[in-house]
Amino acid sequence: MSKPIVMERGVKYRDADKMALIPVKNVATEREALLRKPEWMKIKLPADSTRIQGIKAAMRKNGLHSVCEEASCPNLAECFNHGTATFMILGAICTRRCPFCDVAHGRPVAPDANEPQKLAQTIADMALRYVVITSVDRDDLRDGGAQHFADCITAIREKSPSIKIETLVPDFRGRMDRALEILTATPPDVFNHNLENVPRLYRQVRPGADYNWSLKLLERFKEAHPEIPTKSGLMVGLGETNAEIIEVMRDLRAHGVTMLTLGQYLQPSRHHLPVQRYVSPDEFEEMKAEAMAMGFTHAACGPFVRSSYHADLQAKGEEVK
């Protein structure tokens, strides 16, 4: 019997070490078992990486993190090259260990009290007009990090009064009342929380999360601020069916969600959940049509769509795929 991993505070656990801690064990995928990527999943990298390196340097200088880098997003080059990034607050170590996600797991250090000001100054220096703020899960904090979100929103608006802010929040498991009291008092311009996948696969895909809890979080924020768009996203290719995805879309509409993102799951490493299927662009278009027929005000559906991919265009209602 192998010895349990003793986690040291502030140490990042990734890949095999992270997967060893999940309740539903995942067998590492052998190379010959990997699904071959279809042509539509090929990414063309930009010829000039000057802007990309500039954003990375600004992040390092101010001790900030982007979910683009920490989660190995396939759109990093495109977004950084256009001068956009999704900032990840509350550190780069998550208290959850979802087997689809490349963000490190572990025992995080205390939040940086200066992060809101550093974040606000960086955003002002970059002259951003739309920003997405997300975070790792912080189950170690009494409010799940909600006050830190609020402090960041306040600091950003002080330095950039005309900016639009989208928050992509965790589920605040076990502390929804406390978190919503804080978040509804300092609301963003778009409130986003991802369901990620279908309820049948939740124990496998999102261990520690609850499908109905996440729906309730979205619903309760919408009840407090009916004028603010609520948004959620799902990955496809983890073993779900298109019919199950459409059923989740119905659940989201029933809970007041008005914006949707659907994108292809990509396996970060052989230790993560394997890709079960690649969904074609035509299928994404069909699901988008279903979403719009249900009453979503905007639906971004496509192989490379991620929750914050061209989030500014999504908020304006422009087509993203």
UniProtKB/Swiss-Prot annotation:
This enzyme's EC code(s): 2.8.1.8
Reaction equation(s) it catalyzes: [[Fe-S] cluster scaffold protein carrying a second [4Fe-4S](2+) cluster] + N(6)-octanoyl-L-lysyl-[protein] + 2 oxidized [2Fe-2S]-[ferredoxin] + 2 S-adenosyl-L-methionine + 4 H(+) = [[Fe-S] cluster scaffold protein] + N(6)-[(R)-dihydrolipoyl]-L-lysyl-[protein] + 4 Fe(3+) + 2 hydrogen sulfide + 2 5'-deoxyadenosine + 2 L-methionine + 2 reduced [2Fe-2S]-[ferredoxin]
Pfam family, one: Radical_SAM
Enzyme category, top tier: transferase
Binding site for [4Fe-4S] cluster 1: C68, C73, C79, S308
HAMAP family hit by this protein: Lipoyl_synth (MF_00206)
Family: Belongs to the radical SAM superfamily. Lipoyl synthase family.
NCBIfam families registered for this protein in UniProt: lipA, PRK05481.1, PRK12928.1
Protein name, per record: Lipoyl synthase
Annotated organism of origin: Cronobacter sakazakii (strain ATCC BAA-894)
Gene name, Swiss-Prot/TrEMBL: lipA
